[in-house]
Design a protein with these regions (language model features):
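Hydrophobic, aromatic-enriched alpha-helical segments typical of multi-pass transmembrane helices
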Residues: 10-240
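Short, Lys/Arg-enriched N-terminal segments with co-localized hydrophobic residues
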Residues: 1-8
């Protein structure tokens, strides 16, 4: 009876982690879908940044898309909580202070994820709305002022987000989590860097500007976390058979 109870306890945690990872992956999918809505547009060589894009400025971009992006972000932001739970549960219980710091940074990330998502979506909305009405130069000036003004509040929000995933990355690298080090290949930090740098490398190699570059870079963070959630769920599944 004692052996069966011990076996049950050993299988319960992996089942919880799998559930959390699946819910987290769904949440990241919602967030990434919003990013794809913003980034899936025809690009030109002159396009720069998050909103200085000819397609937005022409008014051709559907104003309903940023609205849907925010709606998807609300659901995704809520489900991000399960990503935080899964990441925190990975870290060895011996490192209590580290777990607490990582968890608090993760909870802060959940709290501000929709704020950042909305900020980016509203820049696309304003650019699309203002471009045909007040001219491209005036629209860019107005949205740039909005971006720079809000950046004072937005920029510090990235610090706890970086810590939440950075701490987990370091603990995994040091062998202080439940996973093997080869799982670093699927870590959000690894994939985020990959998805951000690939379009830059392509442009450096003089590959013509294309929609996939915008989609890949804009959705890099959420797509990277989704990759981890799926990989972690598969890992847990294979180790509980």
């Amino acid at each position: 009876e004692l052996q069966s109870e011990t076996k049950k306890m050993k299988t319960e945690k992996p089942k919880k982690l799998i559930r959390w990872c699946i819910l987290g992956a769904v949440g990241c999918g919602f967030m990434a879908a919003g990013d794809w809505l913003l980034g899936c547009i025809p690009l030109r060589e002159t396009d720069t940044g998050l909103f200085n894009r000819a397609y937005y400025l022409s008014g051709s971009y559907g104003l309903w898309k940023p609205v849907l992006t925010v709606g998807l972000g609300a659901v995704g932001g809520f489900l991000y909580y399960f990503v935080v739970k899964a990441l925190n549960a990975d870290i060895d219980t011996k490192y209590r202070k580290t777990k607490i710091i990582q968890y608090l940074c993760g909870i802060f990330t959940v709290a501000v994820a929709l704020t950042i998502h909305t900020w980016v979506a509203t820049m696309a909305w304003f650019t699309t709305y203002l471009g045909p009405r007040i001219g491209e130069e005036a629209a860019i000036a107005a949205v740039t002022a909005y971006q720079d003004g809000m950046l004072l509040a937005i920029a510090p929000m990235y610090v706890p987000m970086i810590l939440a995933f950075g701490i987990h990355f370091v603990m995994l690298l040091a062998g202080k989590t439940r996973y093997s080090r080869w799982m670093l290949a699927f870590h959000p930090v690894t994939w985020n860097l990959l998805l951000v740098t690939v379009p830059d490398i392509a442009q450096a190699m003089q590959v013509p500007v294309a929609t996939w570059m915008s989609v890949m870079s804009q959705s890099s963070t959420n797509s990277a976390i989704m990759v981890w959630c799926i990989a972690a769920a598969v890992y847990e599944r294979s180790h509980t058979q």
